[in-house]
Amino acid sequence: MKIESPVFGSAEVSDDKVIEFPAGLPGFEHCKRFVLVHEEGSDTAVFLLQSVDDADVAFSITGPEQLGINYEFALSDEEVATLGLASPAEALVAVIVRKDGEAGSPASTGLRANFMAPLVINVEGRRGLQKVINRLGCDIVLRERA
């Protein structure tokens, strides 16, 4: 299938690369199918989660461990069933990240990560969800040391 990305332009993606988010993402419930896009030859740990349903919807994501963060949270039985997980090892956890400001590198302008609503993806089953953690909000800003 052919997708349009405002970041990478037109791209051909096989159907077996599509990740289904049955409930969509909060605020983007109409977007239920996504693909992970990565610039060829790039060694960055940030991927683009591009909606197949709406070309204007895309999120930069990375693994929390790439930011030096390790954390745990529990999934409900319903969430495990939605993902089709047989074991925790099948789950990939990612966080949505965004740059502060308009110019400069993420390290110099600040990189914000949403740790209170991680994405959980069953890589083999190609199903995902966004787990909203209902506790005090937390925003972590990473800045380059002077």
From Swiss-Prot:
Gene Ontology CC annotations of this record: cytoplasm
Position of the signal peptide? none
Alphabetized, the UniProt keywords read: Bacterial flagellum biogenesis, Chaperone, Cytoplasm, Translation regulation
Enumerate the subcellular locations listed in this protein's record, separating them with semicolons: Cytoplasm
Q: Where is this protein primarily located?
A: cytoplasm
Pfam families given for it? FliW (PF02623)
Source superkingdom? Bacteria
BP terms from Gene Ontology = bacterial-type flagellum assembly; regulation of translation
InterPro entries in UniProt: Flagellar_assembly_factor_FliW (IPR003775), Flagellar_assmbl_FliW_dom_sf (IPR024046)
Q: Tell me the HAMAP family matching this sequence.
A: FliW
* PANTHER family reported for this sequence: FLAGELLAR ASSEMBLY FACTOR FLIW (PTHR39190:SF1)
Q: Which family does it belong to?
A: Belongs to the FliW family.
NCBIfam families named among the record's database cross-references: PRK13284.1
Summary of the function given for this chain in its UniProt record: Acts as an anti-CsrA protein, binds CsrA and prevents it from repressing translation of its target genes, one of which is flagellin. Binds to flagellin and participates in the assembly of the flagellum.
Q: How does it assemble?
A: Interacts with translational regulator CsrA and flagellin(s).
By what name is this protein known? Flagellar assembly factor FliW
Organism from which the protein derives: Azoarcus sp. (strain BH72)
